[in-house]
């Protein structure tokens, strides 16, 4: 769990490789917030498409080798940003970041489902979510802090490359902790092949046609609950996009706060989110109706965003409310992951998590340029209104998922 957590934190760190230093890119290359938001769309489109495909790759070759390749992409992305000469370089970096991010959820959840007992999975999912939030929390502090200390944003990205390289080395050194305990059995012929050999020896043809096997591998895509889970991730991560990427500029425009407040908001939001995930891990292990936990937690976060969007409070209070919204977001996390596990057919873990979590990438990809457009057109309150609306839609979708799963158990 520890190695998976560190790797997961790194992937979330690289979600925010670009946004904390958006002002530096505006100054260096003369870019707009819409253009910068489009960079995040490139990142998450590549990641979303790659994530769905990575689930099949993880099921076929194993999680750990895929994880190593992903971390290598992060190293390359940070080095490209460090040497960037314009917008095109940043687009290339966004593509590399997306390729690196794509395999993480199918790989991580495959490892956790293979290595952690069912009784401890709720806590494992909680720890996994916490590590992601810590990665998000660390990125603004690391990048803005190192940039300020060195007097150059390029040095900050060299530091990010070294960080990803260190985690890559950790994964290589700890490969035995990540490979499934039955790894040796994976190299033996699967049951269908063994049955075919036995049937051939008895004069029967028992092997499945290749086309039938492929259709069977895609059968999980017919499950309506799978696409509800995808939709849940889509709307919830649209809310996260507002906070992570544009809360700083929006607070500056709405309340006159300095742009440096963005680091405080994102870091505070993610740290309280991590605390929420600790508590949420216990809730997910004790409360059967997971959608109720999700509904209450995210409704509270949405309410706080509505207050911030009104402009009726002081700047420091607005910052505090944004940070406090992270607690509700975090509380919902472990219940969300357990809800998806209940919806996952046996033997399709990598494929399901890859498909469902690509909704995360799709949500970020669509939301980022929209929120950037709102800022460019003088509508900072729309950033917080959009976050509130997205969380409330997530509450509704979670209720639908819970209802479908309850009917399936009857």
Each PLM stretch: what is its role?
Residues 50-62, 277-289, 375-376:
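Helix-to-loop junctions at the C-terminal end of transmembrane segments
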Residues 93-132:
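Cytoplasmic helix-loop-helix junction between adjacent transmembrane helices
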């Amino acid at each position: 769990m520890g190695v998976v957590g560190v790797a997961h934190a790194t992937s979330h760190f690289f979600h925010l490789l670009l946004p904390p230093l958006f002002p530096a890119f505006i100054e260096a290359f003369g870019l707009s917030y819409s253009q910068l938001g489009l960079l995040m769309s490139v990142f998450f489109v590549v990641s979303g498409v790659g994530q769905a495909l990575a689930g099949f790759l993880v099921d076929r070759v194993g999680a750990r080798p895929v994880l190593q390749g992903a971390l290598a992409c992060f190293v390359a992305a940070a080095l490209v940003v460090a040497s960037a000469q314009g917008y095109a370089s940043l687009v290339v970096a966004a593509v590399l970041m997306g390729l690196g991010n794509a395999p993480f959820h199918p790989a991580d959840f495959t490892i956790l489902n293979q290595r952690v007992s069912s009784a401890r999975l709720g806590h494992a999912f909680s720890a996994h979510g916490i590590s992601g939030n810590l990665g998000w929390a660390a990125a603004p502090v690391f990048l803005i802090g190192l940039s300020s200390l060195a007097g150059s944003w390029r040095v900050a990205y060299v530091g990010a490359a070294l960080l990803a390289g260190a985690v890559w080395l950790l994964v290589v050194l700890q490969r035995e902790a990540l490979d499934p305990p039955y790894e040796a059995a994976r190299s033996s012929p699967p049951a269908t092949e063994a049955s075919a050999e036995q049937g051939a020896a008895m004069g029967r043809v028992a092997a499945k046609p290749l086309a039938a096997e492929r259709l069977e591998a895609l059968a999980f895509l017919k499950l309506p609950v799978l696409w509800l889970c995808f939709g849940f991730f889509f709307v919830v991560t649209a809310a996260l996009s507002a906070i992570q990427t544009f809360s700083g500029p929006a607070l500056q425009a709405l309340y006159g706060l300095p742009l440096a407040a963005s680091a405080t908001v994102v870091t505070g939001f993610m740290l309280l989110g991590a605390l929420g995930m600790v508590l949420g891990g216990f809730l997910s292990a004790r409360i059967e109706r997971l959608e109720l936990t999700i509904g209450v937690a995210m409704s509270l976060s949405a309410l706080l965003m509505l207050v911030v969007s009104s402009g009726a409070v002081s700047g420091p209070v607005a910052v505090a409310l944004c940070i406090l919204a992270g607690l509700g977001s975090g509380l919902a996390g472990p219940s969300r992951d357990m809800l998806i596990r209940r919806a996952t057919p046996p033997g399709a873990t990598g494929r399901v998590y890859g498909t469902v979590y690509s909704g995360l990438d799709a949500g970020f990809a669509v939301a980022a340029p929209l929120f950037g457009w709102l800022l460019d057109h003088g509508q900072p309150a729309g950033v917080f209104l959009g976050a509130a609306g997205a969380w409330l839609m997530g509450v509704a979708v979670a209720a639908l998922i819970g209802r479908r799963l309850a009917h399936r158990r009857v």
